[in-house]
Swiss-Prot record:
It comes from Rhizobium johnstonii (strain DSM 114642 / LMG 32736 / 3841). It is a peripheral membrane protein. InterPro entries: AAA+_ATPase, ABC_transporter-like_ATP-bd, ABC_transporter-like_CS, ABC_transpr_MalK-like, ABC_transpr_MalK/UgpC-like, Mo/tungstate-bd_C_term_dom, NA-bd_OB-fold, P-loop_NTPase. It is found in: Cell inner membrane. Residues 4-234 form the ABC transporter domain. Transmembrane segments: none annotated. Part of the ABC transporter complex UgpBAEC involved in sn-glycerol-3-phosphate (G3P) import. Responsible for energy coupling to the transport system. It catalyses: sn-glycerol 3-phosphate(out) + ATP + H2O = sn-glycerol 3-phosphate(in) + ADP + phosphate + H(+). SUPFAM superfamilies: MOP-like, P-loop containing nucleoside triphosphate hydrolases. Its EC number is 7.6.2.10. GO terms for biological process: carbohydrate transport; glycerophosphodiester transmembrane transport. This is sn-glycerol-3-phosphate import ATP-binding protein UgpC 3. Keywords: ATP-binding, Cell inner membrane, Cell membrane, Membrane, Nucleotide-binding, Plasmid, Sugar transport, Translocase, Transport.
């Protein structure tokens, strides 16, 4: 196990900056998730940590050692990829043993590590099968097993669940978290899926345009997004972003007090209600556009007042709202997130 320090790391492709100066410390045994949209620099950053990309500026330390010039094999890390990267002509056992054999590990030690990984991942009955005989989830377990047998200082996961269907992704997400907690191995995990990030991470690193927008626990990032980007990216459905003029047009908003510089308010779908709450709220005229039943609750899409501003509410059950019906929507004042659209940052 080890700490990982990323110190003012930059990556340029010619004149194009891909990573624009990242500073991050990963504690021993911590699982950090890099999350953001395609092109934000998260996979590039991971590949620089792994040694698969050169670093333009700055440096990476693993267990206190500057590894900028170290080969990937000499960084004491193990990587799990999206595409499994298994040798098709080898059995599961052969895939698990291959790297250890190449390093000259003794046979008794190889047997011990393979047996331990097989037990942890519950792949013992599959050891003599070829990858083509396995399901996607089983192949990903084998890929993780190949990382485990190395007993590295750190695991690096590069979107390992992207090829799996929705049900299997949920199952493997739980297995990865359970595995990491059992092994207590420092881990960095890359994904574009914010739900995956929220459920796996000790801390999230939200990236955008080659920069870090926010670092924090999943709960802290969700409850207090630092920027308009984070507010719109983290959460499903995402936070509603409403111009202050739309809110102030409501009679009940005349005394609404917000920090100086606020011109945009964020409201989570559960901060908008169709019945008046006991706490302070702003009543808004709304027109129903769409109702999406999603099981035990529904997503209600409405247009506010005479504007073109649409918002999404999370409402219990399957309410009977007709399309184009006029309804009242109540915005909880205590759940408002104040932002400035010029800076993109919070104002409180």
């Amino acid at each position: 196990m080890a700490t990982i320090n990323i110190i003012d790391v930059k990556k340029n492709y010619g004149a194009v900056p891909a990573v624009k100066g990242i500073n991050l410390s990963v504690a021993d045994g911590e699982l950090i998730v890099l999350v953001g949209p395609s092109g934000c620099g998260k996979s590039t950053l991971l590949r620089m940590i792994a040694g698969l990309e050169t670093i333009s500026e700055g440096h990476v330390e693993i267990a206190g050692r500057n590894v900028n010039k170290a080969e990937p094999a000499d960084r004491d890390i193990a990587m799990v990829f999206q595409n499994y990267a298994l040798y098709p002509h080898m059995t599961v056992r052969g895939n698990l043993e291959y790297g250890l054999k190449n390093r000259g590990t003794e046979r008794a030690e190889i047997n011990r590590r393979v047996a331990e990984a097989a037990e942890i991942l519950e792949i013992g009955p599959m050891l003599d099968r070829k990858p083509r005989e396995l399901s996607g989830g089983q192949r990903q377990r084998v890929a993780m097993g190949r990382a485990i047998v190395r007993e590295p200082a750190a695991f690096l996961f590069d979107e390992p669940l992207s090829n799996l269907d929705a049900k299997l992704r949920v199952q493997m997400r739980v297995e990865i978290r359970r595995l990491q907690r059992r092994l207590k191995t420092t881990s960095i995990y890359v994904t574009h899926d914010q739900l995956e990030a929220m459920t796996l991470a000790d801390r999230l690193v939200v990236m955008n345009g080659g920069l870090v927008e926010q670092v924090g626990t999943p709960v802290a990032v969700y409850d207090r997004p630092a920027s308009l980007f984070v507010a719109s990216f983290i959460g499903s459905p995402p936070m509603n972003l409403v111009p202050i003029d739309v809110l102030r047009a409501a009679d009940s908003a005349s005394s609404l007090a917000l920090p100086a510089g606020t011109d945009m308010v964020g409201l989570r779908p559960d901060a908008l209600l169709v019945t008046k709450p006991a706490e302070p709220s702003v009543r808004l005229d709304a027109t129903v556009e769409l109702l999406e039943p999603i099981g035990g609750e529904s997503h209600l899409h409405v247009r506010l007042g005479g504007s073109q501003q649409t918002v999404v509410l999370t409402v219990p059950g399957r309410p009977d709202f007709a399309e184009n019906a006029n309804i009242d929507v109540f915005a909880r004042v205590g759940a408002m997130h104040p932002f400035n659209s010029d800076t993109g940052k919070r104002t409180d």
